[in-house]
UniProtKB/Swiss-Prot annotation:
Enzyme class: hydrolase
PROSITE patterns noted in UniProt: ALPHA_L_FUCOSIDASE
Function: Alpha-L-fucosidase is responsible for hydrolyzing the alpha-1,6-linked fucose joined to the reducing-end N-acetylglucosamine of the carbohydrate moieties of glycoproteins.
Protein name (record): Plasma alpha-L-fucosidase
Organism per entry: Rattus norvegicus
Length: 459
């Protein structure tokens, strides 16, 4: 009897293991895939940096949609730019050799990303123009190894980010390409044919994941084709079940026409999405420092860039409503991050050094912003009995009126982050509290562009 049990034990363990594996596996259906819990690190991170870089950085005019606006829509602004600056017969493909990345230094980029306070980065491995920032075998002579830089940009940044920072490394990938012959052929068949995803999109997606192991896979650009044309659910089932990043990878919602804001890991819904209220599903506000372009554009004026005050406001509003902020920059054709982007990144890092406690690893509170003082937004850490009130304007009176928190005498404590001393507060009628802020000179302020009160034991 005992011998029989010993002989049966390996089979029992195998069966148990099989049940555990299958319990965590996902079928290639949205119903199954949408049940996958989002890896915890993403919600804890709160803040990431988006980098739009490609051949569009060579003309660096108008936006990263330069090729489309010039050749497809024939917008006068773009046609005139080419007529005035390039010889007749110049093609968009001719920009490829001019995309030199001459001064691209992945270590410098990584150090700047670390200084920004961001916890993840997403690089455009391929935008709608089809040029890949790695040596894709499926993008012959239209990739960064064969043309222009003659370097594997994706690999260099991946190594630098993982060796020099605590950021999670992510990749953006455009499913479609504006002018690829196979995509245009499929499009003309109302997407009954699938030559393009089979020959181009899917092989590149599998290669990106296996070769660079991104922890964010940011899909975009469905070209009007549904998810079944892209074979999205089969790919995501592999990503979640078998890929080398199956336990940590997060994905967005742009996997085919009709999937956005409906299916996927977290929702982006639209560019610059900031609903201003709590959502039932994890979401991300992907936005740009340059108000009018994701890629670098040399004709931008100073007023076209969001100020640090506006960026802090975006971050605070987004996190208070349960989202992550993905803030975009655009490097130049030779690999330099323009000074104005560098300044904004470093300013965000400076602000987060003081106020990061109220951002990273926080939860939403019962109220997202205050009813009495509108420029106050709330986050919380329930396990520490903490509520954070982030206020974007310092009141002239020196008193901050908060309509939402309810304090308890002898229990509630209030502290200004970066100041370190308890503050005096009183109850307010009909509800809320009034906090007496410290009298500080400009040089004594813990930060410049928004401040945080840590409230202990409030309801």
């Amino acid at each position: 009897m005992r011998l029989g049990l010993l002989m049966f034990l390996p089979l029992l363990l195998l069966a148990t293991r099989y049940r555990a594996v299958t319990a965590l596996s996902y079928d290639p259906t949205w119903e199954s895939l949408d049940r996958r819990p989002l890896p915890a690190w993403f919600d804890q991170a709160k803040f990431g940096i988006f980098i739009h870089w490609g051949v569009f950085s060579v003309p660096s005019f108008g936006s990263e949609w330069f090729w489309w606006y010039w050749q497809k829509e024939r917008r006068p602004k773009f046609v005139d730019f080419m007529d005035n600056n390039y010889p007749p017969g110049f093609k968009y493909e001719d920009f490829g050799v001019l995309f030199t990345a001459k001064y691209f230094n992945a270590n410098q980029w990584a150090d700047l990303l670390q200084a920004s306070g961001a916890k993840y980065v997403v690089l455009t491995s391929k935008h709608h123009e089809g040029f890949t920032l790695w040596g894709s075998a499926h993008s012959w002579n239209w990739n960064a190894v064969d043309e222009g830089p003659k370097r594997d940009i994706v690999k260099e940044l991946e190594v630098a980010v993982r060796n020099r920072t605590d950021l999670h490394f992510g990749l953006y990938y455009s499913l479609f390409e504006w002018f690829h012959p196979l995509f245009l052929e499929d499009q003309s068949s109302a997407f009954q044919k699938q030559r393009f995803p089979v020959a181009k999109t899917l092989p590149e997606l599998y290669e990106l994941v296996t070769k660079y192991q991104p922890e964010v896979l940011w899909s975009d650009g469905d070209g009007g084709a549904p998810d079944h044309y892209w074979n999205s659910t089969d790919f995501l089932a592999w990503l979640y079940n078998e890929s080398p990043v199956r336990d940590t990878v997060v994905t967005n919602d742009r996997w085919g026409a009709g999937s956005i804001c409906k299916h996927g890991g977290y929702y982006t819904c639209s560019d610059r999405y900031n609903p201003g209220h709590l959502l039932p599903h994890k979401w991300e506000n992907c936005m740009t420092i340059d108000k009018f372009s994701w890629g670098y554009r040399r004709e931008a004026e100073i007023g076209d860039y969001l100020t640090i005050e506006e960026l802090v406001k975006q971050l605070v509003e987004t996190v208070s409503c349960g989202g992550n902020l993905l803030m975009n920059i655009g490097p130049t054709l030779d690999g330099i991050i323009p000074v104005i982007f560098e300044e904004r990144l470093r300013q965000m890092g400076t602000w987060l050094k003081v106020n990061g406690e109220a951002i990273y690893e926080t939860h939403t509170w019962r109220s997202q912003n205050d009813t009495v003082t509108p420029d106050v937004w709330y986050t919380s850490k329930p396990e520490k009995k903490l509520v954070y009130a982030i206020f974007l304007k310092w009141p002239i009176s020196g008193k901050l009126f908060l309509g939402q928190p309810i304090g308890s005498l002898g229990e509630t404590e209030v502290e200004l982050l970066g100041h370190g001393r308890p503050l005096t507060w009183t109850s307010s009628k009909p509800s809320g509290i009034v906090v007496e802020l410290p009298r500080l000179s400009v040089h004594q302020m813990p930060c410049k562009w928004g401040w945080t009160l840590a409230l202990t034991n409030v309801t």
